[in-house]
Every structure is written in C-alpha cells, then in structure tokens.
A protein has these predicted regions:
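Bacterial N-terminal signal peptides that target proteins for export
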Residues: 1-12
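N-terminal signal peptide c-region/cleavage motif recognized by signal peptidases
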Residues: 20-21
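C-terminal and inter-domain tail/linker signature
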Residues: 24-158
C-alpha cells in the first residue's frame, strides 16, 4: 500500500480548521454584563448632561483628569476637553446630540449619535467610543460624517 500524499494546501487547510475548532470549543471569554451595563449607563448620563444640557463642568466629574482624546481637534486632559466644548456650546447654544443606539463590550461603550447645531440642521452622524476604567471615562475615539442632502439609497444614516 502506498503512503497517502496530500497537497500542502490541503494539509494547511486541515491545520487551520483544527485550530479554529479548538478556539471555538474554548468559548467566549467570561463577560461581566453588570459592569458593562454600569459603564453604558455612566456614558449615557454623561453624554446627555454634557452634550444636550450643556452641563459641561458638572458632567465632566466622571471624566479622568488624564483623559486621552483621539479626536484630532480636541486636546487631551479633562480641563482642555471641557474648555473646548464650553466654547463650542457658547457658539452653538442649541446644539444637541440624540443617541440613536448604544452598546457596551468590556470597558468600551459605543454610541451612534445624530448631532445637530440647531433645529433644521441635517447634522452629523457620529460614532463615539469611550473607554471606562474604575467608574471614570478615560479615553475617547470618534468618527464623524455629515448627513448629506441626497443619498444614493433610501436608507437613513440612523
């Protein structure tokens, strides 16, 4: 009987399949759903007070002093962050941010937001990501896209 000869690609595929199956069998990491929900609620409350009620100083009580900002227009640190938006709110006192949906995964909280500067403004679609550590917002990323007048499809951005 001759030895079984398999192409290298077939062997590689079997190895990858075996590795994938082992990883799936291990199951997902344990999640602390209660902590994730607490983080989500912390961010939702902060966001509403900060961006809708414009209670920037009060709302920022949950922001870490060494807050790390990934938006290239906003400085790092709690004080510069608050100062930046206090100025923005003075220029746009009717600005608001409607949270369309939110989710949490571990220490990250995700928001999908429709932000407007005034009534009638088409606004911007925003995805904000906050990292929460020990009950404090410590880091932020965002992606911002203007809501266009016309769309290539019938779907909304929200």
């Amino acid at each position: 009987m001759s030895p079984l000869r398999l192409p290298v690609r077939t062997i590689a595929a079997f190895v990858l399949l075996a590795a994938s199956t082992a990883a799936l069998a291990a199951g997902p990491a344990t999640r602390d759903v209660a902590a994730e929900e607490a983080n989500r609620q912390l961010v939702l409350t902060f966001y509403d007070r900060f961006f809708n009620k414009h209670e920037a100083v009060e709302a920022a009580a949950v922001v870490a002093d060494d807050y790390k900002q990934h938006n290239p227009h906003v400085p790092d640190g709690k004080k510069p962050f608050v100062s930046y938006f206090v100025g923005a709110f003075q220029k746009n006192p009717e600005s608001c941010a409607r949270i369309v949906r939110s989710a949490a995964d571990g220490d990250l909280v995700y928001l999908h937001v429709h932000a407007t500067e005034h009534p009638g403004d088409r606004g911007e679609a925003v995805v904000d990501i906050f990292r929460v550590q020990d009950g404090r917002i410590v880091e932020h990323w965002d992606v911002i896209q203007p809501v266009p007048e016309k769309s290539a499809n019938a779907n909304t951005m929200f």
